[in-house]
Structure formats: C-alpha cells, structure tokens
Amino acid sequence: LNNDDKSEKLGVGKSGDQTYKIDKLAENAIIDVIKDNIPDCYIISEEAGNLGKESNEITVLIDPIDGSTNAIHNIPIFSSTILIAKGRRFNEIISTGVYDLNTDEIFLSSENKIPTLNEKQINVSSTETLDSAIISINPRALNNLKKNSNISHLLNEIRYPRCFGSAALEIAYVANGRLDGFIDTTNTLR
C-alpha cells in the first residue's frame, strides 16, 4: 500500500478507535486465516467487533494493527496480535502471538510452554535497578503525570524511558529482554 491508501480513514471500529484502510486489510487477512484453521471459533476484533457463534468454545481475540498511527506514518514499530482462549473470560489462554510486521519476528507463548521468538526460547532481562532500566510507557499514561506523582517519580528514576506506540510489541520486548518493563496506567489497553 502507498501512504495515501493505508492512511485512508474508513470510519470508527467497534472498539471506538479510528479504522484505517491498513487496519481493515490486515483484519480481513487474519480473519480469513483464522476461519480456515479454526472454523468453529468466536472472533473478537478491534475493527469488526464480534464474529461467529457465541456458543463456540474457542475465542480468538485479534488486533490487526497494534500501532496504527506508527504504520500510517511509516514508523516501523507496529504489529499484529492474536490471542486464542477457551471461553470468553480469557482465564484459559491457549496461545498468544505478536507478529512484528517490519522485522518478520514472531513472539509466541502457549499454555505451559516457554515463550519463543522465531521458535527460539526467550527470557526477560536481568536488570534489577531502575537507574539502569530501559522501560517503555504508554504515551497516554503521560497525561496522568499531573494527577499521579508516583509516575513522575518513577520516570525520574528510570534511566531510559521510552514510548514506542505498540503496546503488544513493547510487552513482547519485555518478554525477550529488549525492554526491562512496560508501564500503562490508563486502563485502556484491550
């Protein structure tokens, strides 16, 4: 897609966020693959909302493009995410995946299995102190600085605070030690 095509606004998705053409194209491709491989599932997607029979035991939660703003502005930090669970409460996670569309990296985690990056085991960072930590923060959490002095204090203690704009990818980076932590105080992640 060229820049104009991918940034074309298509309306507001079921999650309440702006839906761009790149979001919808990614969503359609992901849903097609899911329907081919898990035909009897219930899909919850950021753009389309709920698809399938509610009586289906397996639920698949997808965010076709996590970091849409980055994607439409050619900032190469965005991903596609999928979570597969039994039931609707997400307390029995079967598997999760984050696909970095720019590096072709696939972060996977399954029930009772070691998390992997491109099929190789990953581990969290060994950093133990904030003064040497690289911690990412949801940029919307910065709006809470005036309301929450703890966040301000924490940011002053962190050696390298970062804001990347793709929460799923940032959490995957924590899982493999690229980041030492991720902070979100907004309670808006889905």
List the model feature ranges, each with a label.
Residues 1-65:
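N-terminal subdomain of lithium-sensitive/metallo-dependent phosphomonoesterases centered on the IMPase/IPPase/PAP
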Residues 28-32, 81, 172-175:
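Predominant activation on well-ordered alpha-helical scaffold segments within soluble catalytic domains
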Residues 36, 123-190:
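An extended, acidic
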Residues 54-112:
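DPxDG-like acidic metal-binding loop motif
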Residues 42-46, 62, 71, 162-165, ...:
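General beta-strand structural signal in soluble alpha/beta enzymes
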Residues 23, 34, 68, 100, ...:
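Residue-level signal for inorganic ion chemistry
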